[in-house]
Design a protein with these regions (language model features):
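Sec-dependent bacterial lipoprotein signal peptides
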Residues: 1-17
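Surface-exposed, beta-sheet-biased, low-hydrophobicity segments with strongly acidic/polar composition
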Residues: 19-183
Length: 183
């Protein structure tokens, strides 16, 4: 028992040093900006992609595929909404923050204050930062994915939202610049 207690502080210090913001792993994928379109959950064919999976960095369909981080819909009053998992009754897991910064000026995702409980009302030129559902990173530690997005257009007649998104698909990294992130 004394042996364990003697080395416990050293182990704790090593664990903290290894983790940091990137959970002690190296980034392997370069961040890039992509332009994607999502269709409203309601009043569109089920075969159209209505959600986004941040670990894949791709839009996904919601029929039979519940592993997504946020979805798009248009409510009965005509407001365009980005929905994290909370309002969809899938658990308070993913979330958004609206940003006052321009899309290109966002360099790193904040570490907290994501809205997990309610829809984000968006319009053309809305800029937001997204945090994914909690995941287990390749090193076995808990983490999340982060992305910044900029709404480019919302077409009411087709119920389609188009946005540019930079999704850091390196688990646990918060860097939101083009290229391989360092943190």
């Amino acid at each position: 028992m004394r042996y364990v207690l003697r080395y416990l502080p050293l182990f704790a210090l090593a664990l903290v040093a290894a983790c940091g913001d990137s959970l002690g792993i190296q980034a392997s994928a370069a961040n890039k900006v992509d332009t994607v379109s999502m269709y409203a959950l309601s009043k569109t064919p089920v075969a159209t992609p209505s959600a986004y999976n941040m670990s894949f960095g791709a839009v996904v369909r919601t029929d039979g595929f519940t592993a997504f981080d946020f979805a798009f819909d248009i409510d009965s009053t005509g407001r365009a909404l980005l929905l994290p998992t909370g309002p969809l009754k899938l658990g308070r897991l993913s979330g958004f923050q609206v940003s006052a910064l321009a899309f290109d000026s966002i360099r790193i995702a904040p570490s907290g204050r994501y809205n997990l409980d309610s829809a984000l009302v968006v319009d053309v030129n809305t800029v937001a930062i997204a945090q994914s559902r909690p995941v287990t990173c390749p090193n076995g530690l808990p983490g999340a994915y982060y992305a910044k997005l900029h709404v480019l257009s919302i077409v009411d007649s087709t119920r389609r939202l188009t946005m540019e998104i930079l999704d850091d698909t390196n688990c646990g990294f918060r860097g939101l610049q083009v290229g391989v992130p360092r943190s």
